[in-house]
């Protein structure tokens, strides 16, 4: 992978905080030209570093909450089976594979209504066949959320 310079990293950080800034505004912040910003963004997109420009909605105001599900597969090689069992569920918003006490971390987007959330969690847990241990944590408040 090609090494990014300081300006590329700053550009990615700034855009992760506000992707609506114009090339002119970015150029002013980074003390460069609009054309250089355009070239850098094109390069970052081609390298796959910038995958898309998006928003981060306030899920609380939309009537939702997150739950984090920690899963330990029966054996490490079963992790991919577990991931395939759950990845196509609509309210599963991220699935990460890792190393540690739990080897799969899942983020669910659930309605705030506790009965509806409970039903979806039960449905989710029934889909998991190759897990030794599962722990569900309902997120009551997001205090900090940064991409980079």
From Swiss-Prot:
Keywords: DNA-binding, Transcription, Transcription regulation. Residues 23-42 bind DNA. Pfam families: HTH_24. It comes from the Archaea. InterPro entries: AsnC-type_HTH_dom, Dimeric_a/b-barrel, HTH-Siroheme_Decarb, Tscrpt_reg_AsnC-like, Tscrpt_reg_HTH_AsnC-type_CS, WH-like_DNA-bd_sf, WH_DNA-bd_sf. The keyword Oxidoreductase does not apply. Residues 4-65 form the HTH asnC-type domain. GO terms for molecular function: sequence-specific DNA binding. Disulfide bonds: none annotated. This is Uncharacterized HTH-type transcriptional regulator PH0061. It comes from Pyrococcus horikoshii (strain ATCC 700860 / DSM 12428 / JCM 9974 / NBRC 100139 / OT-3). The lineage of its organism: Archaea, Methanobacteriati, Methanobacteriota, Thermococci, Thermococcales.
């Amino acid at each position: 992978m090609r090494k990014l310079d300081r300006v590329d990293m700053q550009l990615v950080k700034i855009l992760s905080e506000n992707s609506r800034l114009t090339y002119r505004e970015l150029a002013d912040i980074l003390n460069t030209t609009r054309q250089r910003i355009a070239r850098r963004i094109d390069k970052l997109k081609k390298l796959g570093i910038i995958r898309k420009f998006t928003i981060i909605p306030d899920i609380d105001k939309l009537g939702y909450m997150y739950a984090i599900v920690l899963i330990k597969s029966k054996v490490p090689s079963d992790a991919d089976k577990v991931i395939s069992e759950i990845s196509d569920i609509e309210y599963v918003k991220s699935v990460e594979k890792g190393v540690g006490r739990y080897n799969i971390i899942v983020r669910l987007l659930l309605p705030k209504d506790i009965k509806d959330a409970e039903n979806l969690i039960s449905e989710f847990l029934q889909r998991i066949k190759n897990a030794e241990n599962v722990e569900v944590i309902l997120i009551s408040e997001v205090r900090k959320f940064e991409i980079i």
